[in-house]
């Protein structure tokens, strides 16, 4: 950038303090320069996103990242003591001790991983699994030492394989891990159409399933997997990024495998590129963002195999990750999808879920020529939406 990035509202405070009577909601946002900006910059900012806070839309802390890191996602481990930052540009993980953020950081090399995407953690806090879209494999790590301890390779079978993995989700009770086949990072026109099931305890690839009713190659690009709460038998939602559809995967106890069905199509809604999903606390609402033209969708899933679209709330181009406030009042939607044209707005839309409308905008990064790639609440405000 031409000008030094200004830190707004810098204050000496402990970021892990509990919620007080003062309005405040601190979130981590990893950011990068918008395309065309000189002197490319990356970093992670702590921003107050609570519209009722006196520090709303101000950066509280800021820490730099290498300008070619291309930080993508931020994940907490099971007890939110550590934040894992994945990289599209480096074969590394940056891991932050959240009690000392950003001063305590560990850089973990993952040399066999190209284009690191999503992470899922085992319930016993012993392992993590990193999807690597560029190398078509999964890295297994020790969640205590954070050192890589294994690799799940792409597989040799034409009907059981890992290819361009992005979304990854472990169901500990079933000992099953889902991995999507999304898109070749070197060629966005080369998209997958499947999900693969892995036995987590043995790291064995069990099966691969096509999620499309179209002839192959359909290029549907399944992107994320989300197990619905309190379902018996267990079931998950999967969204197809290019296909614009939602599918379900339902556990079949007798055969110990999954059945797959399409349950919603975004065709006719004026939206495309469904990305992130999440649930409300009761588990009767499913939230789905769509990147183009940018919206936050609310589904009634009281009948989980017949999701009903209740509301579509326009946000801005590139609607992607989101955070729900601890009181369930607000959704905070990060509007940028890997800095793509028309999907790189750079703002965060604050949605009042009692009114289903945008009531405020966090644009401190956007005004600085930056765009966020992910948002996650700081540990004191964090709640799991999946």
Predicted segments with their positions:
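A generic structural signal for short, non-catalytic loop/turn and secondary-structure boundary residues
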Residues: 8, 21-22
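N-terminal signal peptide c-region/cleavage motif recognized by signal peptidases
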Residues: 16-18
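Predominantly soluble domains enriched in secretory-pathway, periplasmic, or organellar proteins
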Residues: 13, 22-386
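Bacterial N-terminal signal peptides that target proteins for export
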Residues: 1-8
């Amino acid at each position: 950038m031409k000008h030094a990035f200004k830190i707004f509202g810098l204050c000496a405070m402990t970021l892990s303090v509990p919620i007080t009577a003062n309005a405040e909601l601190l979130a981590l946002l990893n950011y990068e320069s918008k395309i065309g900006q000189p002197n490319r910059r990356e970093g992670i900012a702590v921003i107050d996103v609570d519209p009722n806070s006196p520090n709303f839309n101000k950066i509280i802390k800021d820490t730099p990242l290498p300008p070619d890191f291309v930080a993508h996602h931020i994940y907490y481990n099971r007890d939110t003591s550590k934040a894992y930052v994945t990289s599209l540009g480096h074969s590394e993980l940056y891991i932050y001790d959240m009690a000392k953020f950003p001063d305590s950081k560990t850089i973990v090399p993952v040399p066999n991983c190209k284009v690191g995407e999503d992470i899922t953690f085992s319930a016993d806090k012993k392992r993590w699994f990193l999807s690597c879209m560029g190398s078509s494999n999964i890295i297994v790590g020790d969640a205590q030492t954070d050192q890589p301890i294994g690799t799940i390779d792409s597989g040799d079978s034409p009907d059981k394989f890992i290819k361009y993995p992005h979304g990854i989700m472990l169901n500990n009770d079933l000992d099953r891990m889902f991995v999507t086949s999304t898109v070749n990072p070197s060629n966005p026109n080369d998209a997958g159409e499947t999900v693969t099931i892995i036995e987590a305890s043995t790291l064995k690839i069990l099966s691969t399933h096509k999620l499309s009713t179209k002839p192959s190659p359909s290029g549907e690009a399944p992107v994320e997997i989300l197990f619905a709460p309190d379902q018996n038998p267990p079931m998950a939602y999967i969204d197809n990024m290019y296909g614009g559809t939602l599918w379900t995967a339902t556990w079949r106890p007798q055969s110990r495998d999954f059945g797959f069905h399409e349950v919603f199509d975004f065709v006719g809604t004026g939206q495309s590129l469904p990305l992130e999903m999440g649930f409300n606390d009761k588990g009767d609402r499913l939230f789905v963002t769509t990147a183009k033209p940018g919206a936050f969708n609310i589904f009634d899933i009281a009948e989980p195999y017949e999701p009903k679209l209740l509301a579509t709330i326009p946000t801005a181009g590139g609607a992607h990750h989101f955070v729900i406030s601890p009181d369930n009042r607000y959704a905070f939607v990060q509007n940028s999808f890997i800095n793509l044209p028309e999907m790189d707005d750079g703002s965060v839309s604050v949605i009042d879920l009692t009114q289903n409308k945008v009531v405020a905008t966090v644009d401190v990064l956007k005004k600085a020529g930056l765009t966020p790639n992910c948002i996650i609440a700081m540990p004191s405000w964090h709640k799991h939406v999946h």
